[in-house]
Amino acid sequence: MSTIDERVKKIIVEQLGVKEEEVVNSASFVDDLGADSLDTVELVMALEEEFDIEIPDEEAEKITTVQAAIDYVENAGK
């Protein structure tokens, strides 16, 4: 089984169509990876599906970097 970190990064690569090496923990979805608002919504939906969690809109707005996505998923499982 892949780690949460690896699974989140795989989803980001698939959803945003970016290279794996671009998906570093500090990368901003919008500024560094070229995502737009629709991309970020689809990314949150993919995370919800992959990890079987629900991310409220107000929380989703705070998930703006790769690390923020990893942290949210890790904490959602607690």
Curated annotation (Swiss-Prot):
4'-phosphopantetheine is transferred from CoA to a specific serine of apo-ACP by AcpS. This modification is essential for activity because fatty acids are bound in thioester linkage to the sulfhydryl of the prosthetic group. This is Acyl carrier protein. It is found in: Cytoplasm. Pathway: Lipid metabolism; fatty acid biosynthesis. It comes from Proteus mirabilis (strain HI4320). One of its GO terms (cellular component) is membrane. Belongs to the acyl carrier protein (ACP) family. PROSITE patterns: CARRIER (PS50075), PHOSPHOPANTETHEINE (PS00012). Residues 2-77 form the Carrier domain. GO terms for molecular function: acyl binding; acyl carrier activity; phosphopantetheine binding.
